[in-house]
Amino acid sequence: MIRRPPRSTPKPSSAASDVYKRQVAMTAKAHDLKNQGVDVITLSAGEPDFDIPDYIKEAAVNAINENYHKYSPVDGYLDLKKAICKKFKRDNNLDYNTDQIVVSTGAKQSIANVCMSLINKGDEVVIPTPYWVSYSAMVSLADGIPVFVHPDENANYKVTAAQLESAITDKTKMVMLNSPNNPSGSVFTKEEYLEFSKVLMKYPKIIVVSDEIYEHINYGVESVSFASLPGMYERTVTVNGISKAFAMTGWRIGYLGAPKTLAKACNKMQGQITSGANCIAQRAAITALEESPDRIKYMVEEFKIRRDLIIDLVNQINGFNVKEPPSGAFYIFPEVSQLFGKTFDGHLVSNANDLSMLILEKAHVATVPGDAFGYPHCIRISYSASREQIKEAISRIKELLT
């Protein structure tokens, strides 16, 4: 199933604006409850709850003591870009030179740089659903048209190559991919991505943006870099960062590897908006990326325990359906449409937004309604919380909906 907004869609679209307004209202409600002293359990967070590893903290302290406090190069310190190149080779079998790397203020800015550098008015960008909330807004802000492709109901939130191809037209400029996926946690296999690449070989002018920010948070399904597939390196922008894997969301370091001409364009764009990323965070990022990924496996191991725990508990709630255990990230994305049209504690639930607001107001648990991700029949629940918090939160929800 493919959904295109009308040609006259404003920037950003009114639908996206409505979703954003509801998110803002829900966030404000959660803060209001907390300010009143209410014990709100936050299962809406898109960030790890772990502390930053000590060896990375030490690198930041050393950078301060070594007086790294001036503007950095727009595209990042050279030694950080070298560390990123080594990381791409070690983890992803990708060979980039430093002039193909741009360090940004978070992976979100990396993607925005690509959109603003590449998309012209009326260009279409194919976005499989569910998708991270900012993708469509970034496309719209660049005067592009987001084209949403929906997977089949029992496909574990993954579109097929045939569905992807059905969305491509002569106006398609870009395809956005995200694996492991936020919000579903689904991971595309190498075989699935190879089928995508066969389709895209027919359309050599299309650029692929591969958002791999959750790369290291996976539970057995190998995470594949799209650029590593035959014929895809020259037309893929690989986006990553330190936020999720190293629990460094507030440090705001993302980066991309891209064809040289596109990296140069992104560098120019960034130079007129933010310039270089935070200098201390960049120095810490060097240490984070140079160390073995094995040093952060303890986080992934704990996330897997929490994933199994929350699925077991949520599946005991009538009306919640987790189709398959997510293979990556730290979210579950249960289908909840069986609850629509029902009344709980005197409140009618007509949609996922109603359900999330009800759960927040009555059970004091924060979640995110699925319409933010292009899936209005689901809600996103993060298991980036302690096991005790997860048990208490799901117990509250179950009691409310029973």
Residues covered by each model-derived region:
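Single conserved hydrophobic/aromatic residue that forms the stacking wall/gate
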Residues: M1-A16, Y20
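A short helix-loop-beta submotif of the ANL/AMP-binding
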Residues: S140-V147
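Conserved PLP-anchoring active-site segment centered on the Schiff-base-forming lysine
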Residues: S117-V139
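N-terminal small-domain helix-loop-helix segment of the aminotransferase-like
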Residues: K21-G106, N113, A288-E291, L401-T402
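Conserved core segment of the aminotransferase class I/II
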Residues: G231-K304, D308-I317, L401
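PLP-dependent enzyme catalytic core of the Aspartate aminotransferase-like
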Residues: R90, E165-S166, K342-S350, D354-T402
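Conserved glycine-rich beta-strand-loop-beta hairpin in the small C-terminal domain of fold type I
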Residues: I286, E302-V314, V322-K342, H377
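Active-site phosphate-binding strand-loop segment of PLP-dependent enzymes
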Residues: P151-V221
